[in-house]
């Protein structure tokens, strides 16, 4: 039945539409953030994307590796760090982590708006509506009712289409820095560049005109040394270490950078070749599997398209590489934990800033290199040789710091061995740093109970106007 509009009802409808447009609640012309809107047109891709929900196990990495608590002392990751899960959990996990705190207002909390930047297609929507200044200004809480749809279709595809796109301006600027603008890239390169909007190293700028903006530190290249030099020239630090007072760098997840340096990247094997292969449905029709995960789960469609070796051979080879990387990673962690506490002992013994500067530089560089290698998820497959090389330099620099500390402590009259606190478990390490985990967890529980439902209600109301 056709609805007959009176002049009065028509005028009212027009007024409501104008009001919605003025208030900025209309969906963006470029981005449809609601993943379910793609379900009918791209059903096979949508259903496989939805299957990333199967990656639901929560693995507490601080329980697995308690030394991480010490390495990140004074930084949010010492509170809480879980292994990454499937794309379906991106928004859920950033809401639940202790790192984002328990803010109660838009001006409250430890984290900036930029912490949403890789979690949702709502991010490009808000940037398109408000501009980057509008999006990046303020605290993380501000985006709570806006950033609600998890990583999905609109992050990598043009609105309502399968055509790939880079949806984040800061990523496009980074590609231009490497002289590879997305518009001029090959189809194969684009298949990796859409992933590189998020699976990269980044930091939050502190310049006057781009305060809080996300930036990839690629101005001098993507190697660990190039980015280290870039940060050093800026005198940039993510935080000051609570124990050693070192101006620290926190690597995020430079998967794209390490992939480029490895055998797959050097041979132009894209991210999607291994993690989102072409597969056949029950009718024999090919489509791109959007269940991003372990290539060995789809061996014939991934590794098997290039490698003649058996799945068993390739799995065992990767396991061997993981063991080698893990061994060197653990050695670096042991050296760094001791270096941090020995640096504290030197400060306590009266060391000056001038005496400590070269030591803290060694610690900074060592931990940055350790983090660059270990935060690059999948590095044992992507670039095992580069991982071992970088971790080797991390161990060397930590050892350099400890040799200098031993000499300085002797000069300061410290003749007894340094007493290291018990950091053998997550709880003991956090207690040694004076962290009130009981309060943090209680505050987070209150936040989840009282704030998250408000965000969901506001988002539902807004999306009903699209």
From Swiss-Prot:
<keyword id="KW-0813">Transport</keyword>
<feature type="binding site" description="covalent">
    <location>
        <position position="195"/>
    </location>
    <ligand>
        <name>heme c 3</name>
    </ligand>
</feature>
<feature type="binding site" description="covalent">
    <location>
        <position position="153"/>
    </location>
    <ligand>
        <name>heme c 2</name>
    </ligand>
</feature>
<feature type="binding site">
    <location>
        <position position="250"/>
    </location>
    <ligand>
        <name>Ca(2+)</name>
    </ligand>
</feature>
<feature type="binding site">
    <location>
        <position position="253"/>
    </location>
    <ligand>
        <name>substrate</name>
    </ligand>
</feature>
<feature type="binding site">
    <location>
        <position position="202"/>
    </location>
    <ligand>
        <name>substrate</name>
    </ligand>
</feature>
<dbReference type="GO" id="GO:0020037">
    <property type="term" value="F:heme binding"/>
</dbReference>
<dbReference type="Pfam" id="PF02335">
    <property type="entry name" value="Cytochrom_C552"/>
</dbReference>
<comment type="similarity">
    <text>Belongs to the cytochrome c-552 family.</text>
</comment>
<keyword id="KW-0574">Periplasm</keyword>
<keyword id="KW-0732">Signal</keyword>
<feature type="binding site" description="axial binding residue">
    <location>
        <position position="264"/>
    </location>
    <ligand>
        <name>heme c 5</name>
    </ligand>
</feature>
<feature type="binding site" description="axial binding residue">
    <location>
        <position position="157"/>
    </location>
    <ligand>
        <name>heme c 2</name>
    </ligand>
</feature>
<dbReference type="GO" id="GO:0042128">
    <property type="term" value="P:nitrate assimilation"/>
</dbReference>
<feature type="binding site">
    <location>
        <position position="252"/>
    </location>
    <ligand>
        <name>Ca(2+)</name>
    </ligand>
</feature>
<dbReference type="InterPro" id="IPR017570">
    <property type="entry name" value="Cyt_c_NO2Rdtase_formate-dep"/>
</dbReference>
<comment type="function">
    <text>Catalyzes the reduction of nitrite to ammonia, consuming six electrons in the process.</text>
</comment>
<dbReference type="InterPro" id="IPR003321">
    <property type="entry name" value="Cyt_c552"/>
</dbReference>
<feature type="binding site" description="covalent">
    <location>
        <position position="306"/>
    </location>
    <ligand>
        <name>heme c 5</name>
    </ligand>
</feature>
<feature type="binding site" description="axial binding residue">
    <location>
        <position position="290"/>
    </location>
    <ligand>
        <name>heme c 2</name>
    </ligand>
</feature>
<feature type="binding site" description="axial binding residue">
    <location>
        <position position="199"/>
    </location>
    <ligand>
        <name>heme c 3</name>
    </ligand>
</feature>
<dbReference type="GO" id="GO:0030288">
    <property type="term" value="C:outer membrane-bounded periplasmic space"/>
</dbReference>
<keyword id="KW-0106">Calcium</keyword>
<feature type="binding site" description="covalent">
    <location>
        <position position="198"/>
    </location>
    <ligand>
        <name>heme c 3</name>
    </ligand>
</feature>
<feature type="binding site">
    <location>
        <position position="202"/>
    </location>
    <ligand>
        <name>Ca(2+)</name>
    </ligand>
</feature>
<feature type="binding site" description="axial binding residue">
    <location>
        <position position="307"/>
    </location>
    <ligand>
        <name>heme c 5</name>
    </ligand>
</feature>
<feature type="binding site" description="covalent">
    <location>
        <position position="118"/>
    </location>
    <ligand>
        <name>heme</name>
    </ligand>
</feature>
<keyword id="KW-0560">Oxidoreductase</keyword>
<keyword id="KW-0408">Iron</keyword>
<feature type="binding site" description="covalent">
    <location>
        <position position="303"/>
    </location>
    <ligand>
        <name>heme c 5</name>
    </ligand>
</feature>
<keyword id="KW-0249">Electron transport</keyword>
<keyword id="KW-0479">Metal-binding</keyword>
<feature type="binding site" description="axial binding residue">
    <location>
        <position position="119"/>
    </location>
    <ligand>
        <name>heme</name>
    </ligand>
</feature>
<dbReference type="GO" id="GO:0005509">
    <property type="term" value="F:calcium ion binding"/>
</dbReference>
<feature type="binding site" description="covalent">
    <location>
        <position position="156"/>
    </location>
    <ligand>
        <name>heme c 2</name>
    </ligand>
</feature>
<dbReference type="GO" id="GO:0019645">
    <property type="term" value="P:anaerobic electron transport chain"/>
</dbReference>
<comment type="pathway">
    <text>Nitrogen metabolism; nitrate reduction (assimilation).</text>
</comment>
<feature type="binding site" description="axial binding residue">
    <location>
        <position position="275"/>
    </location>
    <ligand>
        <name>heme c 4</name>
    </ligand>
</feature>
<feature type="binding site" description="axial binding residue">
    <location>
        <position position="382"/>
    </location>
    <ligand>
        <name>heme c 4</name>
    </ligand>
</feature>
<feature type="binding site">
    <location>
        <position position="201"/>
    </location>
    <ligand>
        <name>Ca(2+)</name>
    </ligand>
</feature>
<dbReference type="InterPro" id="IPR036280">
    <property type="entry name" value="Multihaem_cyt_sf"/>
</dbReference>
<feature type="binding site" description="axial binding residue">
    <location>
        <position position="87"/>
    </location>
    <ligand>
        <name>heme c 3</name>
    </ligand>
</feature>
């Amino acid at each position: 039945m056709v609805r007959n509009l009176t002049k009065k009802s028509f005028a009212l409808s027009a007024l409501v539409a104008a009001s919605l447009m003025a208030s900025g609640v209309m969906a963006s012309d470029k981005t449809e953030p609601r993943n379910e809107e793609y379900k009918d047109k791209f059903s096979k891709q949508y259903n496989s994307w939805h299957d990333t929900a199967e990656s639901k196990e929560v693995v507490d990495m601080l329980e697995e590796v308690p030394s991480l608590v010490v390495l990140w002392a004074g930084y949010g990751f010492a509170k809480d760090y879980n292994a990454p899960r499937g794309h379906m959990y991106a928004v859920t996990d950033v809401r639940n982590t202790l790192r984002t705190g328990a803010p109660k207002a838009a001006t409250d909390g430890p984290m900036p708006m930029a912490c949403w930047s890789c979690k949702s297609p709502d991010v490009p929507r808000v940037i398109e509506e408000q501009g980057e200044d509008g999006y990046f200004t303020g605290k993380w809480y501000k985006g709570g009712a806006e950033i609600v749809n998890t990583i999905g279709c609109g992050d990598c595809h043009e609105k309502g289409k399968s055509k790939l796109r880079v949806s984040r301006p800061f990523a496009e600027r980074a590609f231009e820095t490497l002289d590879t603008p997305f518009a001029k890239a090959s189809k194969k390169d684009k298949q990796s560049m859409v992933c590189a909007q998020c699976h990269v190293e980044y930091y939050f700028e502190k310049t006057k005109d781009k305060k809080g903006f996300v930036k990839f530190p690629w101005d001098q290249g993507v190697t660990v040394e190039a980015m280290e030099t870039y940060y050093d020239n800026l005198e940039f630090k993510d935080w000051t270490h609570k124990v050693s007072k070192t101006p620290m760098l926190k690597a995020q997840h430079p998967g794209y950078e390490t992939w480029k340096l490895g055998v797959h990247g050097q041979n132009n094997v894209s991210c999607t070749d291994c993690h989102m292969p072409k597969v056949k449905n029950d009718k024999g029709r090919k489509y791109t599997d959007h269940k991003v995960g372990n290539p060995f789960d789809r061996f014939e469609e991934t590794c098997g398209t290039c490698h003649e070796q058996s799945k068993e051979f390739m799995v065992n080879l990767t396991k061997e590489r993981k063991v080698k990387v893990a061994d060197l990673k653990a050695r670096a962690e042991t050296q760094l934990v001791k270096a941090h506490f020995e640096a504290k002992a030197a400060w306590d013994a009266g060391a000056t800033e001038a005496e400590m500067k070269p030591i803290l530089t060694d610690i900074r560089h060592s931990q940055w290199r350790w983090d660059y290698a270990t935060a690059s998820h999948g590095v044992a497959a992507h670039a095992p040789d580069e991982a071992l090389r970088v971790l080797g330099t991390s161990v060397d620099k930590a050892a350099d710091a400890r040799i200098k500390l031993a000499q300085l402590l002797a000069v300061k009259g410290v003749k007894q061995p340094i007493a290291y606190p018990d950091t053998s478990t997550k709880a003991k390490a956090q207690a040694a740093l004076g962290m009130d985990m009981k309060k943090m967890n209680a505050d987070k529980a209150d936040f989840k109970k009282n704030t998250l439902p408000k965000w969901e209600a506001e988002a539902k109301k807004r999306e009903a106007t699209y």
